[in-house]
Amino acid sequence: MSALLRDADLNDFISPGLACVKPAQPQKVEKKPSFEVEVGIESSEPEKVSISLQDCLACAGCITSSEEILLSKQSHKVFLEKWSELEELDERSLAVSISPQCRLSLADYYSMCLADLDRCFQNFMKTKFNAKYVVGTQFGRSISISRINATLKDRVPENEGPLLCSVCPGFVLYAEKTKPELIPHMLDVKSPQQITGNLLKQADPTCYHLSIMPCFDKKLEASREECEKEVDCVITPKEFVAMLGDLSIDFKSYMTEYDSSKELCPSGWDYKLHWLSNEGSSSGGYAYQYLLSLQSSNPESDIITIEGKNSDVTEYRLVSKSKGVIASSSEVYGFRNIQNLVRKLSQSASVKKRGIKVKRRGQSVLKSGETSEKTTKVLTADPAKTDFVEVMACPSGCINGGGLLNEEKNANRRKQLAQDLSLAYTKVHSVNIPDIVHAYDDKSNDFKYNLRVIEPSTSSDVVAVGNTW
């Protein structure tokens, strides 16, 4: 949430309705005529604060007055209290998962290489909290990507307009609350956070799952009705560091050369897999992986990259000289770009025409005899005309999540840090998604969200709103 909205002197009179981007309108009250005049008396009705979509996206997920209720189960202090109770009763084990963006952020913060950070983190969770499992999220991400690709292959031929990725809870909440027309175009495949949690709960149904994620919106994702049993608590790297401070712990004192990843991995899992990555963006590579999955059946094709008007918009096209544009996908990050995308997609009458036009335009360009390299110089990215869009609420994507350790940086340094982390991300060894999924995904779980339209709440009861989640 922006600093403006956190100011203590701000009158937080935003009704805690579920559509806070559309603040409740004050009811007009007719005043009875009076012959008495009061001087210097201010209105008894507090002035409502208007939150723009830019404030809402990539923050803490539409949270105002109900913040304490919504996040009552999602903080490092709650984790410490809960784990203390569980440890005394000795009823449950601890399972910890951490995303690659968080690992890179912590490695940068503690001036460690990624391998040292991973060993240090594993040792800390095992020694301090007696963790049974400590894993990365690549296993869950691989399954998420595979399920998304399979869904796209089924739905793209029949869908009018692009299909939208739903792994970013900030975008999902925005669509469910304010843009219900987008929901039919959104994929319901769960994120790596939830799939990892589901798999850990299968390995040990009694485990308490702590997930460390790059943004605060992931807390709200874990609070969804269909997700509650998969993740017990979500904290960010900022909160992880704050927890160490509360415990007066020197994290670097847990550095070790011993790799405990094998013994901290559930039985039957590839213990190396969790700490790897995959080709594509530092937000998960969903857009790129879709085309990569199709390229295997089109051996003479190439994937070309088309830059957008800014660095947060990128389009990919799978092309060949014989077939033209075979498929397309795009990445759209940040409020302004999401707003532009939604504006185009909301024009439902022209969505189908745009879907046809993009392929015809692509084919005509390639059939003119130009090479793929030359073609990219004359094309402009247009996500609204692609088959699939990887949407992330944070500018620069998940590598710039609000929960990462970059709060003290100014705008330029923050952007540079995101670029540095993205570069470091590309150096993480990549895995082949089809190989992983073939070996480990038994297809017995659907791993799906229950996407739905969220109607604005008419209740002013904060507790009632919190219970809605």
Curated annotation (Swiss-Prot):
Task: Output the GO biological process annotations, alphabetical, semicolon-separated.
Answer: iron-sulfur cluster assembly
Q: Where does [4Fe-4S] cluster 2 bind?
A: 168, 215, 394, 398
According to the lineage, what is the superkingdom? Eukaryota
What InterPro entries would the database entry show?
A: Cytosolic_Fe-S_CAF (IPR050340), Fe_hydrogenase (IPR009016), Fe_hydrogenase_lsu_C (IPR004108)
Q: Which Pfam families match?
A: Fe_hyd_lg_C
Keywords, ordered alphabetically: 4Fe-4S, Iron, Iron-sulfur, Metal-binding
- Where [4Fe-4S] cluster 1 binds, per the record, is at 20, 56, 59, 62
Gene Ontology MF, one:
iron-sulfur cluster binding
The keyword DNA-binding is annotated on this UniProt entry? no
Family stated for the protein in its record: Belongs to the NARF family.
Q: Please describe what this protein does.
A: Component of the cytosolic Fe/S protein assembly machinery. Required for maturation of extramitochondrial Fe/S proteins. May play a role in the transfer of pre-assembled Fe/S clusters to target apoproteins.
Protein's name according to its UniProt entry: Cytosolic Fe-S cluster assembly factor NAR1
Organism of origin: Kluyveromyces lactis (strain ATCC 8585 / CBS 2359 / DSM 70799 / NBRC 1267 / NRRL Y-1140 / WM37)
Classification lineage: Eukaryota, Fungi, Dikarya, Ascomycota, Saccharomycotina
The gene for this chain is NAR1
